[in-house]
Amino acid sequence: MTSHTTAAALATLGAAGMVMLAGIAHAAEIRVIGSPGTRAPYTRLVPGFEKATGHKVVTVWGGVNDVAKRVADGETADVVMLPAAQIDGLIKQGKLIPDSRVDVAKSGIGVAIRAGAAKIDISSAEGLKKALLAVKTIAYSTGPSGVYMADLIRKWGIADQVKSKIVPARRNVPIGVMVAAGEAEIGFQQVSELLPVEGIDYLGPLPPDIQETTVFSAAVHKAAGAADAGRALLKFLTAPEAAPVIRKTGMEPG
């Protein structure tokens, strides 16, 4: 997608938002807490929402497990954004409003190496398996992509062989940043989280036969102080006009 096309999509979205949200009379501050899986499209879309509505969006990012635990333990916000499984869990716990739940975007797992490093064959599952056995260090997140990679390694029967190669993920540090710094030879994370990172070569997504797609969802907190504005934000993020912006970041609309 060209920058002109992206700008046009944002302009259209802003115009749509003006009509869609015209019924909201007073500007509010919306507190959002979430994991960074949707950060790339979210940060492109939110300014248009703020311009269209006058609302101010304040966002706090954290790891999937960290954010889910904080909300489960009583932390409040207006909107919570996490992988679908965590959102559904918090709804079951009575923390989030069920009928406010939306799927915002979805992403597969990508693979990256340090910029300039020798390319690795990830075109097939067998090629990727051989790569993991050959490299000295491996990094993956503590979120859904990392859980999946750990399971995949176990299914391949190479967990014992690569155990000493796994570099623990650092809190709130993207895997791409660790790879760029040379902390790991190869890294795995959501495509949308790898693409913005400088200092890495993005090799592409996992082969189709072993790919895992994570759906990122959001819902309004039951204790929200700006529930109506929060619902309006979710409507904006999931409007058809948002789709081109979401795709630009390597994700698909939810």
Language model features with spans:
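Exported/periplasmic ABC-transporter solute-binding proteins
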Residues: 26-75, 81-107, 113-254
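N-terminal secretory signal peptides that target proteins for export/translocation
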Residues: 1-6
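Bacterial N-terminal signal peptides
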Residues: 11-22
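Hydrophobic alpha-helical segments, principally membrane-spanning helices and signal/leader peptides
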Residues: 7-8, 63
